[in-house]
Amino acid sequence: MVKIPFLFLAALLLTAAQAASAQAVIDTTGGRYYRPVFANVTVASGVAYGAAVNSAGINQTLLMDVYQPTSDALARRPVIVFAHQGGFIAGSKTDAYMVSVCTQFARLGYVTASIDYRLLDFGTIIGGGFDTVNIAKSAIRGMQDLRAAVRFFRKDAATTNTYRVNPGYVIVGGSSAGAFAALEVGYLDKVAEVPGYVGIAALGGVEGVSGNPPATAACPRPCST
């Protein structure tokens, strides 16, 4: 007979304690990272982050657009690197969705980047090469290029510090095919995990050769992981 009121009182006290704890949370960022505290964004277009041979056998310069909150004085900012959609055959760093999402996150206080990465070339597609093998290779190239962009920012943080990013807070993301590439960056770390028909070793392995080599004095470990 006494247990029910006691349990009710205990639950009431627990609820009150949780409410008090929630009220005691202190906002240490002034709304940064979850509210658009910056009205304007500054964009550096066409920043070269690497180069690599594409599916057409041409050495392609890899470019990205970097978005930063205007008049931001913070010394070290987290950076989010985005890869666009398009099924590894189409799309661009300037796609409307990429521009929108990069702008929105930059207004929250992040440094953001939208990258162009190597796509399956049109000649291969119309020549009958639009198949599982070539799409898989394009997915690997996209992952390698995204890794190169991550290495670019970590190398920059260790050298010129142009973009003032925190090398410990580098985030990758994307839309559709770009999201797939981001998942590969996060979870694919062994050549043995890739089907043999892809021939990943000939493509440059997991890290790739798209730029900013993973083993340098500034970054003695694979910089993209």
Q: Which residues does each predicted region cover?
A:
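Bacterial Sec-dependent N-terminal signal peptides
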Residues: 1-28
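N-terminal cap/lid segment of alpha/beta-hydrolase-fold proteins
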Residues: 24-75
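Coil residues (strongly favoring Ser/Thr
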Residues: 28, 100-103, 132
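Short beta-strand element of the alpha/beta-hydrolase
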Residues: 75-86
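Serine-hydrolase catalytic-loop signature spanning alpha/beta hydrolases and amidase-signature enzymes
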Residues: 87-90, 112, 152
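Cap/lid segment of the alpha/beta-hydrolase catalytic domain
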Residues: 88-97, 116-140
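Short amphipathic alpha-helix adjacent to the substrate-entry channel of hydrolases
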Residues: 94-114
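Primarily recognizes the serine-hydrolase "nucleophile elbow" in alpha/beta-hydrolase
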Residues: 148-225
